[in-house]
Amino acid sequence: MAEISSVPFAEPPYLRGLPSPYYNESHRRFQKACRAFLYENLLKHAMEWEKAGTVPEHVFSDFCKANMLLPNLPAPLPVAWLKRLGIHDILGVKVEEWDYLHTGIYSDEMARSGLSGPSGSLTAGFAFGTPPIIKYGSKELQEKFLPDLLTGKKRNCIAITEPDAGSDVAGITTTATKSADGKYYIVNGNKKWITNGIWSDYSTMAVRTGGPGAGGLSLLVVPLKNYPGVTMQRLKVSGQITGGTTYIELDEVKVPVENLIGLEGDGMKMIMNNFNHERLTIAVGVTRQARVALSTAFSYCLKREAFGKTLMDQPVVRHRLAKAGAELETMWAFVEQLLYQLTNLPKEEADRQLGGITAMAKAKGAMVLNECAQTAVLLFGGAGFTKQGQGELAEAILRDVPGARIPGGSEDVLLDLSIRQLVKLFKAEEKKLGKARI
C-alpha cells in the first residue's frame, strides 16, 4: 500500500503528523511522489521477485527513465553534469535543490518492502561505484564514463572486498601492474561478495599498484561484462537474494591507464570517503527494515490469540515490543540528525567531523534491525520460521540481518573505527586550542 500506515512504529514520526524541524515543503512533496512511484514500480512486487531470485530487467530501465537512480548519489548532486545530460529534476525536485534529507527520504522509502535485495539489485552498484568517478576522476575519465552511467545506459559496481580482505581494506591483494609500454594496467586477483557485479559493465575497483599497506592502493575503472580475462559467477547468499552478489576472477586483464581514478596511491583515502555515503544510506535503509519487521509483528499481536486472549494483552509481549520500539525510534532520531547535519555542512567538513559518527550509525542501525527482526520472528512463533504465510516477511527480514551487519564495514570494526575517529578529532581540536593531550 502507498498510504501512510497508522500502525505504531510503521512510519517515521514526521509522516504521522508529528512536528519535525527538519523537513520543508520540497521534502514532503518528494516523499509523496517517491512513495507512489516506488509502490507501483518496485514495492508491490518485491516479495514475489525476492522469492524468484531476480528483479525483471525492465525495472532498472523504468527507474532510469524517471531519474530515480540519481538519488543514490551523495548530495549535492553533480548538477552541471545532470543538466548537460538534460536532467533537471527528480520527481519535481530541481537537481540543484537536492539535499541529504531528500536522500534520506529516498533511502527510507526504498526499504519500505522490508527487503533489501530488490532495491539493492537496482541501486547498490550505482550508489557506491559512481561517486568516486564524479569526485576524483579526471575530466577525460568523466567524459568517458559518466554520460552512460548517469543515464543508466551502462551499469557499474564497487569492487573492494576479496576472499581474504573485507573490512581490512589495506590487506587487499588484487594487483594492477603497468605493461611494458606503459599503456595498460594488467590486473590479476579476485573480488568476492560484489553486489550487482553480475550485471555490471564496469567496476570501480580497489587494486594494489604499489607496496603493502594502505599507501599501495589505487582505484581503477575495470571493464567487466564480456571483457577478456574477466570471469564472473553469481553467489548464493542467505539474504538479499536478488542483489546479484558476485565472485569476480581477474586474469591478466588489460585496463587502459587512463582508467585510473585520481592518483596512484590515493585509493585508501578515496575508499574511506566513499564509505561515509555508503554507511549512511545503509543506516537509513536498515532502520526502515526494522520498522517493517516491528510494525508487522505489532499488527499480528493485536489479532493473534493465545491462552484465551490476544498476544497484545500479554505483558511479556508488550515488554518485547517496547524494548525494540525504543531502540527503533532512538535510531531514527540518530539518522535524522545526521541527515540534517550533512545537509548543512560543507562536504569536506562533514567528512572530517562525521565520519566516525556515520560508522557508528551504520553499526547501530544493524544492531537495531537485528533486535526488531528477532523480536518479530519470536512473536510470530512458528509462522516467523516459515517462508510462506503471514510470517514470511519477518522470516525474510531476519535473513537479511547479516547483510546489514557485515557489508560497508563489519559491526565490530566500525564501532572501533568510530571511537578512533572521535579520539583523533578530539586531539586535533585540543591541539588547535593549545590544550594538553589526553
UniProtKB/Swiss-Prot annotation:
Which superkingdom heads the taxonomic lineage of this protein's source?
A: Eukaryota
Q: Which GO terms describe its molecular function?
A: acyl-CoA dehydrogenase activity; flavin adenine dinucleotide binding
Q: Name one Pfam family in it.
A: Acyl-CoA_dh_N
EC class name: oxidoreductase
Induction per UniProt is: Expression is positively regulated by the aspyridones cluster specific transcription regulator apdR.
Q: GO annotations under biological process?
A: fatty acid beta-oxidation using acyl-CoA dehydrogenase
Q: Which GO terms describe its cellular component?
A: cytoplasm; intracellular membrane-bounded organelle
* UniProt xrefs under SUPFAM superfamilies: Acyl-CoA dehydrogenase C-terminal domain-like, Acyl-CoA dehydrogenase NM domain-like
Q: InterPro entries given for it?
A: Acyl-CoA_dehydrogenase, Acyl-CoA_DH_CS, Acyl-CoA_Oxase/DH_mid-dom, Acyl-CoA_Oxase/DH_mid-dom_sf, AcylCo_DH-like_C, AcylCo_DH/oxidase_C, AcylCoA_DH/ox_N, AcylCoA_DH/ox_N_sf
Q: In which pathway does it act?
A: Secondary metabolite biosynthesis
PROSITE patterns reported in the protein's UniProt record? ACYL_COA_DH_1
Q: Which cofactor does it need?
A: FAD
EC number(s) for this protein?
1.-.-.-
Name the keywords, alphabetized. Answer: FAD, Flavoprotein, Oxidoreductase
Report the family membership. Answer: Belongs to the acyl-CoA dehydrogenase family.
Q: Quote the PANTHER family the UniProt record gives.
A: ACYL-COA DEHYDROGENASE APDG, MEDIUM-CHAIN SPECIFIC ACYL-COA DEHYDROGENASE, MITOCHONDRIAL-RELATED
What this chain does, per the entry, is described as: Acyl-CoA dehydrogenase; part of the gene cluster that mediates the biosynthesis of aspyridones. The polyketide-amino acid backbone preaspyridone A is first assembled by the PKS-NRPS hybrid apdA. The assembly of preaspyridone A is initiated by loading of malonyl-CoA onto apdA, followed by decarboxylation to yield the acetyl starter unit. The growing polyketide chain then elongates into a tetraketide. The adpA PKS module catalyzes three Claisen condensations, as well as beta-keto processing and methylation.
Which protein, by its recorded name, is this?
A: Acyl-CoA dehydrogenase apdG
Q: Which organism is it from?
A: Emericella nidulans (strain FGSC A4 / ATCC 38163 / CBS 112.46 / NRRL 194 / M139)
Gene symbol?
apdG
